[in-house]
Amino acid sequence: MTVALCYGLPAVWQADAQILILGSLPGVTSLRAAQYYAHPRNQFWPLLQQLAGINASLRYEDRIAALKQQRLALWDLIGAAERRGSLDSAITPASIQLNDFSVLLQQLPALRAVWLNGGTAAKAWQKLNKAGLTLPAAVQVFALPSSSPAHAALSFADKLQYWRQAYQQTLTTNTGE
């Protein structure tokens, strides 16, 4: 049985973004809503509420505006892939088509950090690096635990600790500007 390709969402960014948060591929709920991290149990927006004061209960459009105001950008490493359901483990590896980051990275001159949201994102990032993607030396890369509800190995508090550490290290690096 053939599985249709799932296509990701467009990048959410602005030229002054300092942090680019990269997921793997949006789940079914997010794709249907055309919204990043739309699943009600995904902890992404609650994590950003704790880190950057972005109210997780705002309408999606308002959360995106607040995200941009905080100089954060969003995208996914996988632009398209075959997948049954929403789990990253259901992605057919041979079908993965990575997004082209070369153009986006040129549009982000203030970029200071790339945050990889979960293990699948980290693996896809490694593939991009092997394919020749290069970042300016000042850009830090953080592999973070997934905000997905499927990643239950860590509690919200534990995930928040990792995400907060990345946030603080990114801010500390930027204090010299």
Segments and roles (model prediction):
Residues 29-92:
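Short, surface-exposed acidic-centric catalytic microdomains
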Residues 69-124:
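Internal catalytic-core helix/loop-beta-alpha segment
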Residues 26-29, 43, 79-83, 119-123, ...:
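Short, solvent-exposed loop/turn segments at secondary-structure junctions
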Residues 1-11, 39-40, 87-102, 126-177:
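C-terminal capping/extension of enzyme domains
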Residues 16-17, 110-112, 138:
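A general structural motif
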Residues 18-24:
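Short, hydrophobic/glycine-enriched beta-strand segments
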Residues 48, 124-125:
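Hydrophobic packing residues within well-ordered alpha-helices of enzyme cores
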